[in-house]
């Protein structure tokens, strides 16, 4: 375990234990502690697992890696939902950047790279994805053969890459050193490069409702829990210029609510998810009216757009 004595965002030594939560979406029931910085309100896992030990929490049974197939006979419906999400993310890029054939989209923490495949199809540009392992694509290489997929960390990216758009769809909360990664990305960026970050929002109604069962903890994979205040501080310290901060994202906030309910229920996450599908759909219908309020008060997600210059 790695103990941290200074806030990773502001450097303060004034820390306090905030909450203890059990492992989520995993077969063990290990208890972990999250600290909170008294200066900038940043919440982070402390102590945290060593990187090599954390890898066991990203097995091939990890639900995001299993994707739509985890839902058995309902696979088609879930895959359509993923396609819809990917297209929302493609649109988010089109809204902030003009791209051509030689343009490069770099997705950090790409997991199963369906988003990059959608970018190829809709934007007709070059796509690069990087993750710390290849579990998200190793069994479907033919589906993603036109995408430049790499195993490694941000620090492993070449200095001459120069992406036009960098995306972090629920990656930054997993990063062991977010300031170092953001600074590294800034160094390889062009003046026109755009950065899109989507993360769970600590200052959200779902976190307040579910407390230790909030799926945003994603214990122990999520090392950082950001609020608008400290993620803006993080970006400024990394020399990125913040353009916009939204209290919502492309991901449906209902997913956080549903996963939180499943944590309360104590389901086995590596099982066939068929039996949960009907309840998932009914819950989504009941949740729909709350979405009208997410632009005023975060339900669980936030998005930050930043410029290199």
Question: Residue ranges of each PLM-predicted region?
Answer:
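A C-terminal cap/extension of S-adenosyl-L-methionine-dependent methyltransferases
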Residues: 2-5, 20-26, 247-309
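Conserved SAM-binding loop
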Residues: 3-4, 85-212, 223-237, 302-308
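Short glycine/proline- and charge-enriched loop/turn segments
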Residues: 72-75, 210-219, 259-267
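Conserved SAM-binding loop and adjacent beta-strand
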Residues: 74-89
């Amino acid at each position: 375990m790695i103990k941290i004595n200074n806030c990773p965002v502001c450097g303060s030594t004034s820390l306090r234990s905030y909450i203890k939560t059990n492992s989520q979406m995993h077969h063990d029931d290990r208890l972990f502690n999250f600290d909170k910085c008294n200066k900038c309100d940043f919440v982070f896992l402390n102590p945290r697992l060593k990187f090599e030990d954390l890898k066991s929490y990203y097995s091939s049974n990890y639900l995001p890696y299993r994707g739509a197939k985890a839902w058995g006979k309902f696979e088609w419906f879930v895959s359509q939902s993923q396609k819809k999400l990917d297209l929302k993310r493609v649109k988010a890029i089109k809204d902030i950047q003009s791209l051509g054939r030689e343009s490069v989209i770099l997705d950090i923490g790409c997991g199963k790279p369906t988003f990059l495949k959608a970018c190829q199809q809709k934007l007709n540009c070059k796509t690069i994805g990087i993750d710390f392992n290849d579990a998200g694509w190793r069994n479907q290489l033919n589906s993603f053969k036109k995408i430049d997929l790499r195993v490694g960390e941000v620090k492993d990216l070449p200095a001459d890459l120069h992406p036009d758009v960098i995306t972090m769809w629920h990656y930054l909360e997993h990063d062991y050193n977010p300031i170092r990664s953001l600074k590294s990305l800034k160094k390889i960026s062009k003046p026109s490069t755009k950065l899109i970050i989507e993360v769970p929002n600590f200052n959200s109604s779902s976190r307040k409702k579910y407390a230790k069962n909030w799926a945003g903890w994603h214990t122990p994979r999520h090392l950082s829990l950001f609020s608008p205040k400290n993620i803006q501080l993080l970006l400024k310290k990394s020399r990125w210029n913040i353009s916009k901060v939204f209290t919502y994202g492309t991901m449906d906030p209902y997913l956080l609510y549903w996963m939180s309910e499943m944590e309360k229920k104590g389901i086995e996450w590596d099982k066939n998810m068929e039996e949960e599908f009907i309840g998932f759909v009914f819950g989504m219908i009941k949740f729909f009216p709350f979405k009208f309020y997410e632009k005023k008060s975060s339900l669980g997600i936030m998005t930050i757009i930043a410029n290199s210059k």
